[in-house]
Design a protein with these regions (language model features):
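Short gly/ser-rich loop at a beta-strand->alpha-helix junction or flexible surface loop bordering the NTP-binding
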Residues: 1-165, 201, 281-298
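Surface segments flanking catalytic/ligand-binding clefts of nucleic-acid enzymes
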Residues: 1-9, 14, 143-298
């Protein structure tokens, strides 16, 4: 779980010099807003919105995921999602979605004074209700950081019975891999699977004359290495030079016949990733574009 690095005051817009309005009656100073990461902005928004509610509810879904510090993939939802056990149907108001539902024993916790669904309940809600790619991004994250166990998630999902989204959630839990080191790698893995590309080995290590190097993806049958490049990975010129030497050493290995690099733009675009991977020598068995909501085995 992450917290804001420093205290950010939410006030009425008229009290601020250069306000960024969060919603009616709530704003923060622009420099403070611009200093926050996307996740910190989402957390701040949830806290401010919840503070404006007239009745106590339990923060849920993507709003709870923000409080837990979980990554996401789907377009940012700036509405506050809560469970209101008094309702018999979901109600959508100005910036707030009040869901029906019940909170079982152990499914309610308090984060920074805000009633929130437990981590397990939050992850299962995301896995059932968001896109398959979003589900895998979150599941890879919680498995990697040992926040939850696959067996526990599978058991908790089974206990829910035949609820909406249970098949997608089960497929996402089975597909998740703790070795994925970033949301970009998780998204890449899902997109590659939907293109019919064989499952890669993750974080495979190679011994080269320049030393031992670990790669993001390795397809041994095709002899192809795949690397997801984050936007900030090579800002340091020295890091860029080191990476060039690393890639040269890997390309010279006899078992390596292709090398593919891509960014988040390609990772999230089936057609673009298909072009990158096929040019490196990987067989693309399904035509792009393909819906990111399709599940493994479908």
């Amino acid at each position: 779980m992450s917290t804001l690095a420093h205290t950010v005051l939410v006030r009425v817009p008229s009290a601020l010099h250069d306000p960024v309005r969060l919603f009616h009656g709530a704003a923060i100073e622009r420099p403070e807003w611009e200093a926050l990461s996307l996740l910190e902005r989402r957390r701040l928004f949830v806290r401010a919105r919840y503070g404006a509610l007239a009745s106590e509810c339990v923060v849920s879904g993507t709003s709870a995921a923000a409080l837990w510090g979980l990554p996401d993939f789907d377009a940012a939802d700036w509405r506050l999602h809560v469970i209101d056990i008094r309702l018999d149907k979901t109600h959508t108001g100005r910036g707030v979605v009040r869901h029906t539902g019940r909170i079982r024993n152990g499914e309610r916790v308090v984060i920074e004074g805000i009633p929130t669904t437990s981590l397990e309940r939050t992850v299962l809600d995301i896995a059932r209700r968001q896109s398959f790619t979003h589900a895998v991004v979150v599941l890879d994250h919680v498995l990697r950081f040992d926040m939850l166990r696959r067996e526990g998630l599978a058991g908790a999902l089974e206990a829910l019975g035949r609820v909406r989204g249970c098949r997608q959630a089960a497929a996402a839990i089975a597909f998740a891999d703790a070795r994925a080191e970033s949301p970009g790698e998780s998204i890449s893995r899902v997109t590659a699977h939907l293109l019919g590309i064989p499952a890669p080995e993750l974080q495979h290590e190679f011994e080269t004359p320049r030393g031992r190097f670990r790669t993001d993806f390795w397809w041994p049958d095709a002899g192809v290495i795949g690397e997801f490049d984050g936007r900030l990975k090579y800002e340091d010129p020295r890091a860029l030079w080191d990476e060039k030497n690393r890639e040269d050493a890997l390309r010279r290995l006899p078992e390596v016949r292709g090398f593919a690099r891509w960014t988040m733009r390609e990772a999230a675009d089936a057609r673009a990733l298909a072009a990158v991977l096929s040019s490196a020598g990987l067989p693309v068995l399904r035509a792009a574009p393909i819906s990111a909501r399709r599940q493994p085995g479908s």
